Curated annotation (Swiss-Prot):
Gene3D superfamilies: NAD(P)-binding Rossmann-like Domain. It comes from Methylorubrum extorquens (strain ATCC 14718 / DSM 1338 / JCM 2805 / NCIMB 9133 / AM1) (Methylobacterium extorquens). The gene is hprA. The active site is at residues 230, 259, 280. One of its GO terms (molecular function) is hydroxypyruvate reductase (NADH) activity. Uses both NAD and NADP. Belongs to the D-isomer specific 2-hydroxyacid dehydrogenase family. It catalyses: (R)-glycerate + NAD(+) = 3-hydroxypyruvate + NADH + H(+). Its EC number is 1.1.1.29. NAD(+) binds at residues 74, 157-158, 228-230, 254, 280-283. PANTHER family: D-ISOMER SPECIFIC 2-HYDROXYACID DEHYDROGENASE CATALYTIC DOMAIN-CONTAINING PROTEIN-RELATED (PTHR43761:SF1), D-ISOMER SPECIFIC 2-HYDROXYACID DEHYDROGENASE FAMILY PROTEIN (AFU_ORTHOLOGUE AFUA_1G13630) (PTHR43761). Homodimer. CDD domains: 2-Hacid_dh_4. This is Glycerate dehydrogenase. Keywords: Cytoplasm, NAD, NADP, Oxidoreductase. The lineage of its organism: Bacteria, Pseudomonadati, Pseudomonadota, Alphaproteobacteria, Hyphomicrobiales.
Length: 314
């Protein structure tokens, strides 16, 4: 029997999506955002493929034929999983694809911020070097990576992959996770002892704004905060104030609370030498995206074969 499959935001994945191994009718759209568009485009579809399209309870109620939501990402906070479960809809996600791309982005942000690479490069373009009385100048502090301490909040597969890279660079690694593991420390230790802190936890009601003004004040004044996970983990207003006040040394963010920031965002709009914001691309190396695309199709094919894999529980 032919299955109707719809990819609602194909533009979000720059990789080849191979043809399915079962009889199917396939349709893709570059982007889909409004509930009305979602419902219209998924009429009669059994399988929805999405990346960041919001699948809320009111929308799902209007899609009686839907049986599978295949998310082209690890995070599934865009899906109302409880509503999906109640309606008999299976939700699957992508796992273990970003083992190089995200850690490398974290390390890149760490080097850029600790070594003040961006502000110094910008100063050269402004002509500051031409005007210098010496062969160099020290407008922005530079700190070594080797010998410094990395604090990892969320010690899953990505956290462990980053830890290996950090140790190879000569860093001391501290890690915190809500799930007990040998060798972990508490959050207070991470905040007070780390030179660089990187976040790798999902966005849940418990983790929303887990880093706010109180936590930022506990960090070293030279410390760097890196977030390549979810924007809602950090109170952005508190972070911006901390950067302006010198409460912490800098921040590197690949995510913000609302994406895309169509109405502006205080971090994206800020002009600070100690802040780097990239447009949610830490996951998006060419290699990683192809691994993701292949696994996305694998997930759909496994479901159709009656052997669902990578199922996300409500």
């Amino acid at each position: 029997m032919t299955k109707k499959v719809v990819f609602l935001d194909r533009e979000s994945l720059d990789a080849t999506v191979r043809e399915f191994n079962f009889p199917h009718e396939y349709k893709e759209y570059e982007s889909t955002w409004t509930p009305e568009e979602i419902v219209e485009r998924l009429q009669g579809a059994e399988i929805a493929m999405i990346n960041k399209v919001p699948m809320r309870a009111d929308t799902l109620k209007q899609l009686p034929d839907l049986k599978l939501i295949a998310v082209a990402a690890t995070g599934t906070d865009v899906v109302d999983k409880a509503a999906a479960k109640a309606q008999g809809i299976t939700v699957v996600n992508i796992r273990n694809y970003a083992f190089n791309t995200v850690p490398e982005h974290v390390v890149g942000l760490m080097f850029a911020l600790r070594r003040a690479i961006v502000p110094y490069a910008n100063s050269v373009r402004r002509g500051d070097w031409n005007k210098s009385k010496q062969f160099c100048y020290f407008d922005y502090p530079i700190y070594d990576i080797a010998g410094s301490t990395l604090g990892i909040i969320g010690y899953g597969a990505l956290g462990k992959s980053i830890a290996k890279r950090a140790e190879a660079l000569g860093m001391k690694v501290l890690a915190f996770d809500v799930f007990p593991q040998d060798g972990l420390v508490d959050l207070e230790t991470i905040l007070t002892q780390s030179d660089v802190i990187t976040l790798h936890v999902p966005l849940t009601p418990d983790t929303k704004n887990m880093i706010g003004a109180e936590q930022l004040k506990k960090m070293k004044r030279s410390a760097i905060l890196i977030n390549t996970a979810r924007g809602g983990l950090v109170d952005e207003a508190a972070l911006l104030q901390a950067l302006k006040d010198g409460t912490i040394g800098g921040a590197g963010f690949d995510v913000v609370a609302q994406e895309p920031p169509k109405d502006g965002n205080i971090l994206c709009d800020a002009d600070l030498p100690n802040l780097i914001v990239t447009p949610h691309v830490a996951w998006a190396s060419k290699e990683a995206m192809q691994i993701l695309a292949d696994q996305l199709v694998d997930n759909v094919e496994a479901f159709v074969a009656g052997k669902p894999q990578n199922v996300v529980e409500a």
